[in-house]
């Protein structure tokens, strides 16, 4: 018997490059997946024909609180792979707080369902965002660049605020929500999972010396968080950084 059959996961941002890989990985592990997608054609037929995948055609912020609570119900975990598209409208248009607002509303949906056990919330974030729960060193030059990014690129602020919401408003002792915010470095595409390293904090500059992280490795780690309690217990309430193993100290 597949021990993952009882695991149901809600994925938002599943039409993105990493989100699709996560859905594929979860299905391969025998999990049941609900995926909120704006476009019904974002998944290949080989995936949509899977009886354990349920597609919800909607924009996540357009859902009512009641609908969001229904979609979140019976889910062991909720994963946000949301991001802003790399276009002028995606970067400077509305909603400028897509990731933050979706995280807040999804966590509120979890709380409203009053589950007897905490629900896992996994956020895909970025190494450009510091974990302010830790004393992560940052150079003056990088601090200046980050300051400019906050002024010029609204998505960077959105990523910061989403993680800050989990750190400060959900915190470490919430009875309903446990969380992990994953910080990949420069994302690349690869065909298969390779060895990767996980660190509590960045081991190289995200601005001046960024490492590489394959999307499929990020998806693999997120799936491990959901399906392996020993992995979850190690990283819950933290913001792990993920690098390709051969690139971590290159």
Where are these regions (language model features)?
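Glycine/proline-rich active-site loop of Rossmann-fold NAD(P)-dependent oxidoreductases
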Residues: 131-134, 191-196, 227-237
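Conserved beta-loop-beta element that borders a ligand/cofactor-binding pocket
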Residues: 163-189
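Short-chain dehydrogenase/reductase
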Residues: 92-100, 138-141, 148-161, 208-216
